[in-house]
Amino acid sequence: MKVLKKFIYNYKLINLLKMNKIKCAKGCCILNFTNEIHHFKNKNISKNSHRESAGIAIIVDENMDKKILITQSYNNLWGVPKGKKESNETLLECASREVVEESGIKVDVSSLKSCEEIIFIPNYDKKLTIHIFKYFIPFVDYISCSMNNLCLKDLHDDSTGFGWINLKCLNEITKAKTIKLNSLTKYILRKI
């Protein structure tokens, strides 16, 4: 058992050393990511049928200072955690599962029932409907909800990084082209 614990600790340490950081100009927000290349599974997705995805925009509102959780995925785009709905799950279950897969953070499905839902149909695929639930929380334990406490393996090859970022800082670093947001997240930010 001791050997296993030591192996897990060393594995996490090695993965932490591979992490890169993006800081906002003020230094108050840090996004952690890796340059590891993902080998995404080729999903046989029919563009002929209607499909649904779901996710959560987790917004922390601490002393009138709003921060949002964003993850990095395909094409190094950053955005709210979301993904394809499986046939055996509800939209809320899908949203909760995707947050765990992309950030390691667990959100109870029952706490999402009263959340406002944002519906987005992307221009590139009119047969896809994305449901995002706005989830406001008063504070977050950044120590337990940080990349430092995750192995890359924990992210299920769905994410190459994540972080909490102040909405003002996010606006500044996207204008400076330090990071690039996906179209869904740009849409959501206009609704917050």
Swiss-Prot record:
Where in this protein would one find the motif Nudix box, according to its record?
A: 83-104
For this chain's UniProt record, which GO biological process terms are given?
AMP biosynthetic process; ATP biosynthetic process
The protein's required cofactors? Mg(2+); Mn(2+)
Which UniProt keywords are listed?
Hydrolase, Magnesium, Manganese, Metal-binding
Q: Where is the Nudix hydrolase domain?
A: 49-187
Q: What is this protein called?
A: Putative hydrolase 414L
Ligand binding (Mg(2+)): 98, 102, 158
Per the similarity annotation, which family is this? Belongs to the Nudix hydrolase family.
Q: Name one GO molecular function term.
A: bis(5'-nucleosyl)-tetraphosphatase (asymmetrical) activity
Give the EC number(s) under which this enzyme is classified.
3.6.1.-
Group of enzyme by EC: hydrolase
